[in-house]
């Protein structure tokens, strides 16, 4: 059933009741919006395309290469030419990782229509500056940032308009996109248009760990040592994983445990073998992994040794694509 595939490796569905109704609907449409901003990391270019690939035979999937959004957000210095090269890298990476049946669209295609801007204005008229300010974290910005650059207030309205204009039943995104998706659901009621189900995936922590227990720091391509990037070679992955924060007997706030739970175990396709002098451990599911790690049955060094070749294998399709492009332009 569709609902089972939606729930797999998902942090939150808003609402579960609405999602269950989609099992009885034909022609379900969905979208995910991605800002092109350079060389993507394992969460963007491995986890998401592999999750969506499991759904591509059941539903229509739009991948929105959000070039205008990236320009507003000053990604790649706001250079649209560079941003579009980044978008092409994203598209090729997603396809290499298995998402071959999606329809890839550029935001610049959408905004070329007067109907889009009519929808944008109708959306804006049903929001407030206060609500848009609360939504700024979707682009990693604050009110102070927007006070210096008013275009940042346009970003959340565009994201909501994307959802309405594409007329989708499902909006995919990380938990950092929750504000925009909830804004879309609220405005949908006011505009009497389709209210998209929100399917939120997990965010991966920085490999360096978090500085405080209450301060989540996510994996970021802007800090290469915090993330596994798709152009990382085996030696790079080995260095980053071996240096990564990985407290023993603890999975919460453990970036390597998160990669295991949200990337490797769901999408590797085979059991994961942890080599131990006392006898190997075969990991078959997330619950077993968590229990074995928390109990001390798996040590951090043993986990790291097992993860390195699997990560290398899983990013290889996207890495081949990256090697065919001049990545120095993103430096």
From Swiss-Prot:
One GO cellular component term noted in the UniProt record for this chain: cytoplasm
Secretion signal span: none
Binding annotation for L-tyrosine: 31, 155, 159, 162, 177
Positions occupied by motif 'KMSKS' region: 218-222
Gene: tyrS
Family: Belongs to the class-I aminoacyl-tRNA synthetase family. TyrS type 4 subfamily.
Catalytic activity annotation: tRNA(Tyr) + L-tyrosine + ATP = L-tyrosyl-tRNA(Tyr) + AMP + diphosphate + H(+)
HAMAP family in the record: Tyr_tRNA_synth_type4
Keyword Transferase: no
UniProt keyword Cytoplasm present: yes
Assembly and interaction partners: Homodimer.
Alphabetically ordered keywords of this record: Aminoacyl-tRNA synthetase, ATP-binding, Cytoplasm, Ligase, Nucleotide-binding, Protein biosynthesis
EC number: 6.1.1.1
A molecular function GO annotation: tyrosine-tRNA ligase activity
Name of this protein: Tyrosine--tRNA ligase
Compartment(s): Cytoplasm
Residues that coordinate or bind ATP: 221
Species in which this protein is naturally found: Thermoplasma volcanium (strain ATCC 51530 / DSM 4299 / JCM 9571 / NBRC 15438 / GSS1)
A GO biological-process term: tyrosyl-tRNA aminoacylation
Pfam family, one: tRNA-synt_1b
InterPro entries associated with the record: aa-tRNA-synth_Ic (IPR002305), Rossmann-like_a/b/a_fold (IPR014729), Tyr-tRNA-ligase_4 (IPR023678), Tyr-tRNA-ligase_arc/euk-type (IPR023617), Tyr-tRNA_synthase (IPR050489)
Free-text function comment from the UniProt entry: Catalyzes the attachment of tyrosine to tRNA(Tyr) in a two-step reaction: tyrosine is first activated by ATP to form Tyr-AMP and then transferred to the acceptor end of tRNA(Tyr).
């Amino acid at each position: 059933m569709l609902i089972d595939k939606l729930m797999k490796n998902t942090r939150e569905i808003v609402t579960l009741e609405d999602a269950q109704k989609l099992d009885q609907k034909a022609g379900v449409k969905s979208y995910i919006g991605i800002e092109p901003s350079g060389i993507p990391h394992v969460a963007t270019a491995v986890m998401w395309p592999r999750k969506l690939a499991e759904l591509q035979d059941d539903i229509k999937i739009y991948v929105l290469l959000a070039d205008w959004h990236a320009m507003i957000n000053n990604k790649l210095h706001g250079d649209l030419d560079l941003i579009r090269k980044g978008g092409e890298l994203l598209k090729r990476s997603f396809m290499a990782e298995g998402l071959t049946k999606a329809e890839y669209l550029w935001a610049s295609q959408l905004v070329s229509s007067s109907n889009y801007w009519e929808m944008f204005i109708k959306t804006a008229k049903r929001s407030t500056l206060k609500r848009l300010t609360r939504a700024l974290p979707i682009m990693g910005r604050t009110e102070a940032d927007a006070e210096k650059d008013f275009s940042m207030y346009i970003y959340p309205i565009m994201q909501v308009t994307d959802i309405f204009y594409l007329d989708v039943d499902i909006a995919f995104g990380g938990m950092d996109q929750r504000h925009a998706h909830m804004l879309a659901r609220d405005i949908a009621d006011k505009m009497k248009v389709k209210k998209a189900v929100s399917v939120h995936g997990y965010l991966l922590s920085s490999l360096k760990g978090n500085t405080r227990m209450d301060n989540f720091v996510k994996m970021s391509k802007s800090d290469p040592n915090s993330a596994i990037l798709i152009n990382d070679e085996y030696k790079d992955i080995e260095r980053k994983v071996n240096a990564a924060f990985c407290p023993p007997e603890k999975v919460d706030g453990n970036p390597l445990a998160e990669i295991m739970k949200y990337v490797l175990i769901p999408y590797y396709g085979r059991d994961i073998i942890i080599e131990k002098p006392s006898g190997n451990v075969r990991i078959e599911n997330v619950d077993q992994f968590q229990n074995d790690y928390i109990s001390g049955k798996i040590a951090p060094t043993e986990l790291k040794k097992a993860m390195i070749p699997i990560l290398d294998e899983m990013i290889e399709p996207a890495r081949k694509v990256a090697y065919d492009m001049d990545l120095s332009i993103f430096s």
